Amino acid sequence: MSSHQEPVVLGKLGASHGIKGWLKITSYTDSVEDIFDYSPWLIKEQGEWREVKVAQWRYQGKAIIAALEGVTTRDQAQMLTNCEIAIPAEAMKALPEDEFYWRDLIGCEVVNTKGYKMGKVDQIVETGSNDVLLVKANAKDGFGKTERMIPFVTEQFILEVNLAEKQILVDWDPDF
């Protein structure tokens, strides 16, 4: 791979299906079919990324299965079970202004309007109504917090996201 950025994981190869090398696909994309908008895929085998192309895919009941070029037997498919499916970071679709990929928010420092450093985004939780930042508090948090949950609601709680500085400005009480 030519990129210095870590590939973006979009899913995982599941169990083999049938005798012709098809595999079940677990997709982490918003719509499960969106994983097929990207080509080629990178799969991680024995710690190394390698390129593969999808020859064809289809629904099998509620599951999605795919045939990969060069994988023509059940034994070959079984060797790929549980491999991650990724794409180069630069292949990600551009987002409109004020929309962000979760992976870009992870690790950002969260600071409130009074300049208090609340910690770093550890993960993001999807709740249905809005996403929530799980912020791991700094070791010497002045309010005794170990983590904070801040709704990702722009203009109300999230005032500014500066990816270049890896910083998120929030209107949030550090004691909450």
UniProtKB/Swiss-Prot annotation:
Alphabetical GO biological process terms: ribosomal small subunit biogenesis; rRNA processing
Signal peptide, first to last residue: none
Keywords: Chaperone, Cytoplasm, Ribosome biogenesis, rRNA processing
Domain of life: Bacteria
Domain PRC barrel: residue ranges: 97-176
Taxonomic classification: Bacteria, Pseudomonadati, Pseudomonadota, Gammaproteobacteria, Alteromonadales
GO annotations of cellular component type: cytoplasm; ribosome
Compartments where located: Cytoplasm
A matching Pfam family: RimM
InterPro entries: PRC_barrel-like_sf, PRC_RimM, RimM, RimM_N, RimM_N_sf, Transl_B-barrel_sf
Description of how the protein assembles with itself and partners: Binds ribosomal protein uS19.
Family the entry assigns: Belongs to the RimM family.
Alphabetized PANTHER family for the sequence: RIBOSOME MATURATION FACTOR RIMM
Molecular function terms, GO-annotated: ribosome binding
Function: An accessory protein needed during the final step in the assembly of 30S ribosomal subunit, possibly for assembly of the head region. Essential for efficient processing of 16S rRNA. May be needed both before and after RbfA during the maturation of 16S rRNA. It has affinity for free ribosomal 30S subunits but not for 70S ribosomes.
Transmembrane domains' residue ranges: none
Domain description: The PRC barrel domain binds ribosomal protein uS19.
Name of the featured protein: Ribosome maturation factor RimM
